[in-house]
Amino acid sequence: MLFYEKLEVSVAKLNKANLKKTLYYLQRNGLRETWISVRERLTETDRYFFVPCSEAELVRQSDRKWEKPITFSIVVPLYRTPEAYLNRMITSVMQQSYPHWELILADATEDHSVEEVLMQQGFLKEQPTDGETEPVAADPRLHYVHLKENAGIAANTNQALPYAKGEYIGLLDHDDVLTPDALYEMADAIIKAYDRGVKVAFAYSDEDKCDGEETRYYEPNYKEEFNYDLILSNNYICHFLVMESKLLKSLQFRPEFDGAQDYDLVLRCVAEVLTEGGQTAEKRILHIPKVLYHWRCHEASTAANPNSKKYAYDAGMRALQDHADRRHIPATATETRHVGFYRLKYKEVWEARPDVAAVGGRVLSGKNGKIIGGRMTAAGAVFYEGLPKGFGGYLHRAELSQDAEALDLRCIRIQPSCQEVFEKIVGVPYTEIRRHPGEQPVFDVTVLPLGADIRTLSLQLSEALRQRGRLLYLPEYPEEFKPL
């Protein structure tokens, strides 16, 4: 392919990736960072195809008899919701294969335009009352409330909570869509957890995005099992979220965090769970590894245009700082180069995070600057392996702080109280160096004997350290050198 042909393909691909995002990124981060980001976007391939649940499977789910069914209240704050999106959102709930739900619509629109649309679509009907008529739901599982004023999304949602009678409350935006099996999968997972003796505090699923017409699905967000330090970097939990009704009603949404009210809620719920039982209580936070939610992208949505709700990202950073302050973590919440992604900066990590046994950074090849080590699975697979320096990787996760199952010995720092564990397993005294001025210290890997099995030692050490605390992957600990 000739150069100008390659350029034409690249420009077309960039347009699809949303030119507005690129221009906004340029304003925030400058030309060099934008060039690196554009290069990364142009290497990505969009091979995602959403595969819906089959009709046969939906029938099987509908026919299932539940001995002790979980009841859900789906809460949706409405405000000037476009007619087509409103219809599709409600229909996506009505078509659930799981029957034990109710849908609560809290309408803050100043006039009765949304109410009239609901009448026209058959979701509401008029009922005579004392010589007058008032709107009532055509389906007894649907509850419509017209709020007196638009007090903001947090306050509007709070006003809907007293109407929720379910054991769990699910959060759905007024222009988004649930998959038909969403509540079935949630109920099934929560009941299985209960059978294991676990009372789920909240559960979340994977999600993707769709265009305004739901003709294209893209950018799937395949999430991890609960990862504390990842949620301190980004609200990766997001959609679809269901939370214990009692817990959500006690916490409620806080209007001062409008735009990031979901993130603030999740952070406060996480704090409740951790206060209750530390890391062992994290099993009360459940991940369902299946796309159950379509986040609709259109001109006004945050998903399509980050600049449309910049206040939301500012509120997210304030929510993170509030979480750190409430948990007495001496740290400062800061932005990263990606909107909606944050970092807690610790002056001294051991003072701030006594729950952490070790921190580790990425290991870069001295030859071409690609990731060759850092965060690993318990089996030794390297996360983000081969990713060039400067690239953020899938959903920017290579640049985000997160808990790890294993860390690479070549870029690790050990909590002082755990250093005897290091010496017992690695077989050499633990010594630290600063490879570059201004950087945090790391283990001096040069004291290892020539030919040491780095991978095996890393995995053995990590397994032992996990019994003492978290293993924290901090991508701001980069070290460039040739592999031993």
What do these predicted ranges mean?
Residues 99, 107-116, 123, 149, ...:
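A conserved acidic beta->alpha catalytic loop
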Residues 147-164:
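Glycine-rich, basic loop-to-helix element that forms the pyrophosphate-binding segment
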Residues 90-100:
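Short, acidic, metal-binding catalytic loop of nucleotide-sugar glycosyltransferases
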Residues 162, 216-248, 258, 370, ...:
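A recurrent flexible, glycine/aromatic-enriched loop bordering the glycosyltransferase active site
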